[in-house]
From Swiss-Prot:
Record key words, sorted: Antiviral defense, ATP-binding, GTP-binding, Immunity, Innate immunity, Magnesium, Manganese, Metal-binding, Nucleotide-binding, Nucleotidyltransferase, RNA-binding, Transferase
Enzyme Commission number(s): 2.7.7.86
GO MF annotations, alphabetized: 2',3'-cyclic GMP-AMP synthase activity; ATP binding; double-stranded DNA binding; GTP binding; metal ion binding; RNA binding
Binding site for ATP: S57, E69, F70, D71, Q241, E242, Q243, E244, K262, S275, Y276, Y277, I278, K279
Superkingdom per UniProt: Eukaryota
GO biological process: defense response to virus; innate immune response
Annotated source species: Asbolus verrucosus
Protein name, entry field: Cyclic GMP-AMP synthase-like receptor
Swiss-Prot/TrEMBL catalytic activity: GTP + ATP = 2',3'-cGAMP + 2 diphosphate; GTP + ATP = pppGp(2'-5')A + diphosphate; pppGp(2'-5')A = 2',3'-cGAMP + diphosphate
Binding site residues for GTP: D189
Reported function: Nucleotidyltransferase that catalyzes the formation of cyclic GMP-AMP (2',3'-cGAMP) from ATP and GTP and plays a key role in innate immunity. Acts as a key sensor of double-stranded RNA (dsRNA), the presence of dsRNA in the cytoplasm being a danger signal that triggers the immune responses. Directly binds dsRNA, activating the nucleotidyltransferase activity, leading to synthesis of 2',3'-cGAMP, a second messenger that binds to and activates Sting, thereby triggering the immune response via activation of the NF-kappa-B transcription factor.
Family: Belongs to the mab-21 family.
Length: 383
């Protein structure tokens, strides 16, 4: 079993260092150039912009397959003088943000140029509105893109590392830049988020910050599942990505295990299990086990975590790492989870009694070549 998993990890679910290096250079150059255009077009964005956070599975080291999609958070700040106040909502994992001293800030010099635009991000009671922020962000991205030279239906973005064709698409809370040239084609999701320091860390049953070197957290304009009579546009999802990245780092077989679990999920067709649910199982495992566990053989780590994962599915509950009141599986039907639990039980049994079935369960086949006694691998499907 160990040799099989090591082969799969090495040949299929790990990205080459050359690909990682190339994509990092191109992506950083494109994003910094485009953000510069956005700052030129909008004084409010220029005032609030802090930095880019390179988020998602690629930068966490958890991506399976070719790196073609990237998640970037544009971190913005709110004027302190306006007294932004975060309060936990009735939905675990979500908060409200209200500007308690907006009128006084509007009289400050810095508000003279941007005050009217800033008020458009709020609702009638001075709560920061996800809907309004998304509309503002969509307009800004299009204005920045429209300033670029055109080539047919696309725009040309010239950066220090080359010129790329860019087109804009909208998807959920993100504005997607589709970037391509003769050698590369990638999608970059840009999401406007707001960043806060440790003085605003949420309480009320939220876990305290376990990573002192990362005091900041974000709020993201992602809507919750909530009754129609609720003010949905006031709900902001909390994000502790920087802390999570530190918690899962420098643990030898942790990231290969996550990739194997994602590969298994995809091949079994369990697409209702979000990658973040798997990451949350891992975060709980980090709490429950010391660092030496992740240095044990990959087969031991993978099978142990797979059994942990099955237990969560059997109990129909994966507690949100940062607030256990939030069950990440609450939106999935009981019958669906029962069927998944039964399937995982059979998978675990087969893997333990017949390790060669791992190839099939992970969607990979291999052929033995007697000529040189080496295995040659071929993916059944690209993830």
């Amino acid at each position: 079993m160990e040799n099989i998993l090591q082969d799969i990890n090495k040949n299929f679910i790990s990205l080459s260092n050359d690909e990682i290096r190339r994509n990092n250079i191109i992506l950083d150059s494109v994003v910094q150039t485009f953000v510069g255009k956005m700052k030129e077009k909008d004084p409010l964005f220029n005032l609030m912009y802090r930095r880019v956070f390179y988020g998602g599975s690629f930068y966490d080291g958890l991506r399976v397959g070719k790196p073609k999609e990237f998640d970037l958070d544009l971190l913005l700040t709110l004027p302190n003088f306006a007294q932004p106040v975060l309060t936990t909502s009735n939905i675990p994992g979500f908060v409200f943000l209200k500007l308690e001293n907006l009128d006084a800030w509007m009289r400050q010099p810095e508000a003279q140029r941007v005050g009217a635009s800033f008020k458009k991000l709020l609702d009638g009671r001075n709560y920061l509105s996800t809907a309004n922020v998304l509309v503002w962000m969509e307009g800004l991205v299009h204005r920045a893109a429209n300033d670029l030279p055109a080539r047919g239906s696309k725009r040309l973005l010239t950066t220090p590392v080359g010129t790329f064709e860019v087109s804009i698409h909208k998807g959920g809370p993100a504005m997607t830049l589709h970037i391509c040239d003769s050698e590369i084609e990638i999608d970059v999701d840009l999401v406007a988020c707001f960043v806060f320091g440790s003085n605003k860390w949420p309480t009320n049953r939220f876990r305290s910050n376990p990573v002192n070197s990362k005091p900041e957290f974000f709020i993201v304009p992602k809507k919750p599942r909530a009754p129609e009579d609720q003010p949905i546009q006031r709900y902001w999802r909390l994000s502790f990505q920087e802390q999570e990245r530190v918690l899962i780092d420098n643990k030898q077989y942790l990231k290969p295990t996550v990739k194997l679990l994602k590969q298994l999920r995809d091949n079994l067709g369990h697409n209702f299990i979000a990658s973040y649910y798997i990451k949350t199982v891992i975060l709980h495992a980090v709490d429950e086990r010391d660092d030496s566990f992740w240095r044990r053989p990959l087969s031991h780590v993978f099978m142990t975590i797979l059994k942990d994962f099955k237990t969560y599915i059997e109990r129909k509950k994966i507690p949100y790492y940062w607030n256990s009141n939030n069950n990440l599986l609450s939106g999935i039907g009981e019958r669906t989870l029962e069927n998944m639990n039964n399937r995982l039980r059979n998978v675990i049994r087969d893997m333990e009694t017949r390790p060669e079935t791992m190839w099939e369960y992970l969607g990979i086949k291999y052929t033995m070549y007697s000529k040189d006694s080496k295995k040659q691998f071929k993916e059944l499907s690209e993830v």
